[in-house]
């Protein structure tokens, strides 16, 4: 799908739910404050948004003649990376994982209080093949002195269906007796 951003036309992008995904700018912009008119293919937003240096005006027009890329919309292109060192930066992570393919989005989760990474990140590749190469190439490998784990990211619905943690039996309470001397 092509989108016109003022004077700039982005040839391939995806609209998923309330998010506008533009791989050329490696950014995701929420358009939840606007509305999507499917009949005319017009997305109108009430506010201006900055995506990779391009300011989206109050009206975005879409070209519905071209279809969105199916490879980037699948959940198998999103990876979960855990075990990251607190010293790992976004640049280090990007440089490490770009060798496996076109990395179109990266979210290193930060601890806002301590102002450092929490030790995990989410990555999105353009195709499933690139994501699988990244899993095979980096799962169990060292990055900044720590072993990292790379796997397909689970959706929230998968997490809610997961088997709950085993409940341990509560200790039986006995009446306490205190000795008085």
From Swiss-Prot:
Keyword Lipid metabolism: no
One GO cellular component, as annotated: chloroplast
CDD domains: RRM_SF
Cellular compartments annotated: Plastid, Chloroplast
Effect of loss of the gene: Dwarf plants and pale green leaf phenotype.
Alphabetized GO MF terms: mRNA binding
Domain RRM stretches: 77-155
Main location: plastid
UniProt entry keywords in alphabetical sequence: Chloroplast, mRNA processing, Plastid, RNA-binding, Transit peptide
Region (Disordered): 155-181
One record GO biological process: cytidine to uridine editing
Record: transit peptide: 1-44
Basic and acidic residues bias: start-end ranges: 155-169
Subunit structure, as described in the record: Interacts with MORF8/RIP1, MORF2/RIP2, MORF9/RIP9 and VAR3/OZ1.
PANTHER family to which the protein is assigned, alphabetical: NUCLEOLAR PROTEIN 8
Role description: Involved in C-to-U editing of chloroplastic RNA. Required for the photosynthetic subunit psbF transcript editing in chloroplast.
Name of the protein this chain belongs to: Organelle RRM domain-containing protein 6, chloroplastic
